[in-house]
Structure formats: C-alpha cells, structure tokens
C-alpha cells in the first residue's frame, strides 16, 4: 500500500490577455503550491477502481480514473489498482484539488514503472486532462501562460503564511469564463512590472500589483464569494480570489474577527502557507 499527498495550489494573480478563436482564453497567472493536501491511498487490486470521499462523482468521470486510463494507453501497461482519494481540498474552490490528484497519481505511476514515460509525454497526458494538471507535475512556484499549460518554473518558492476562506459554494469555471469580454483583457506589456518583481521573491511588493480579472467576474456572479471578500476588505486585509473562485485568500494570519465570522457564517477557514 502507498500513501500519497496531493497539494493544493493558489493562483496568486490571474490576468486574461486574449480570447482565442476556439473559445479558450490566453492567460497569465502565478501558480504556487500550498502546504495543504488531499490524501491518496493506492494498493493492488483485481481491477482498476477509483473511489473518493465524494460518492456523487462517477468513477468514469473522475479525473484520476481518466489519468490512469491515459497512462495505460501511452504505456500499454494495465493498472490493476484501487485508488482511494480522501478529499480535504475544497471542490470548486479554485485550489486545483482534482488536477493535483491526477498529477500526483501520474507521477507515482511513472516512478513505479521506472520512468517509462519521458517528461514531455507526461506533460502531454496532463494537458489532455486539464489546464492546471501540468503545473502539479512539478509544483512550487511557476508562471502559467497559454491556457495555463505553458509553464515557467521559478528556481525558488515563497514560504509566507496564508489563510483562505471557502464560502461553501462551488464556482463553475466555464460560467465565469463565459462572462469575459474585451474590456477586462490585459496588455502583456503591462505585466512587465510583475515579471520584474517575481525575481525578487518579495510577496509584499508583488501583492501591491497582483490582480485577478477572472476573480472579479466570480465576485459579480456569486454573492457568497463577494460577502467573504467584502468582509476581509472591511477588516483592512487585501483579499484576492484564487482562479475562478470560490476561495478567497489573504497573505498573513487570520485575526480573531476572521475566526469568529467564519464560525458564524459557516465558512471553511484554512490556515496554511506557500510551499
């Protein structure tokens, strides 16, 4: 039996730079993994079975099942395994839990089979599974471009404390992206300040310029997200939405007021750090 830990991520910032003819959007985003995980248990089994603590997700629709199936197709090696995913990362929160699960299992399978697939083939599989999956093959701190799959991994990571509010609502990424119009597109030249600050690894300097244009749409679509965001603003924090939502994050530690509000509102408060 093997136990794997599958990390969450945060989009520290996200800018939309273009809309492609195929309907997808070109983005510029800053990915960073968190010290916060799902747990995955893998053991030998008579046949492939993927189970999760969310029984409403059918096996064939589970991204981990799809990842294993693609690995089988690329290698010709049948995987008779039972995979049990214990979810801790909120679903639909913009923290990449499912994508991380898929990448973690892909890395495990490739290592188990003596790195049968070169890195570029693993990335090829990851891109087929979803825009965030390639990032999780390595994790750490990275710039994501294209639809998020064109990655520049930075040599160092940040380690600041961070807290996250999950307002107990799932944000639908497709719905959020469908509301993007030309008025919120960012000229890539305007991101030069971000590129220069990244190399200083100073989150406080970077934070002053970080935006999430997609998150602004999520705030308009989901009153629950806006309520958490506005509350943190009221307390003097600089909250940001992660990805397309629904999680709202703040660099630093939560105050007693945040702890109390989370308990009253039924929000999930996650205290972690960049890793």
Swiss-Prot record:
GO terms for molecular function: 4-(cytidine 5'-diphospho)-2-C-methyl-D-erythritol kinase activity; ATP binding. It catalyses: 4-CDP-2-C-methyl-D-erythritol + ATP = 4-CDP-2-C-methyl-D-erythritol 2-phosphate + ADP + H(+). NCBIfam families: ispE, PRK14611.1. The keyword Thylakoid does not apply. The gene is ispE. It comes from Sulfurihydrogenibium sp. (strain YO3AOP1). Its EC number is 2.7.1.148. The active site is at residues 9, 132. This is 4-diphosphocytidyl-2-C-methyl-D-erythritol kinase. Keywords: ATP-binding, Isoprene biosynthesis, Kinase, Nucleotide-binding, Transferase. It comes from the Bacteria.
